[in-house]
Amino acid sequence: FHGVDNEGNSLNGFPILLEGNNADIWGSAVADDIDNDGEIEFVISSKNKHCYIIDQYGNIELDFESEHFLMATPSLANLDSDNDLEIIMYSYSSSGDIYAINHNGTNVPNFPVNINEKILKGGAIYDLNNNGKDDIVVATENDDLIAIIYDDGTISNLFTGSDKFKTVPSIINNNGEIIIVAGNEDGFYYGVNLDGSLKFTVVTGGSIHSSSGFVEFNNQLGIFFGSEDGYLYGIDINGNALPGWPQNISGDSTENRINSSPVFADLNNDQIPEVITASEEGLI
């Protein structure tokens, strides 16, 4: 696990070599002041079945061992009534264990839960039932589900897609209307209401492994995602294509699949955000 400064030099205490077999880090690190000590901690999970809390000096504050591969990016959420953040881990196993622990490694009440579904990339966090506590949304491989795990461990299977989900879902609050979006292996990008009904479907020509990116411009929310058909898609909150979208960045190549999530910046100071993504062929 690497920590570098703005010139690419390793920070003191980094890199950290994880121990054990299969110590690959597939997901991203997440960071916050988990225990309210005034310092930022990093959380990473690994295929070696461990999750680590690491401080900004490279010290491992917690090494939590699970029973399953932890391939997905962990999440931070407030699942209970204290002021500390809890750590959520997603197992890549047929039992579909979802762990939630405190910063000292103890389990959050009612966790872990088993959803009997493999989760590859991670989950989304939001208070869906307005009780002041966060809930978890995941998209799964086995039965092609979008599911909600509420703060008390209750599971609600919200929607069944046409094929496996291998991406992280996203949650949109559109003036009080909750929409969950995710793409699947069939190339379908779904917008799902909180009651499980479909708000929209966008059909692409390839599998969708890209998580969604969001940008607001001219008082309108733009939703962007890539597909393995080589197109970058831009849609509005109703699933309609934005003017000028989708954009084909693959040309005649069959290798320019877009599996990276888009990011946004006003690169030329014209008050219009640019969309930045990367292709599997190595193009930005």
Residue ranges of predicted features:
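Extracytoplasmic/lumenal domain signature
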Residues: 1-284
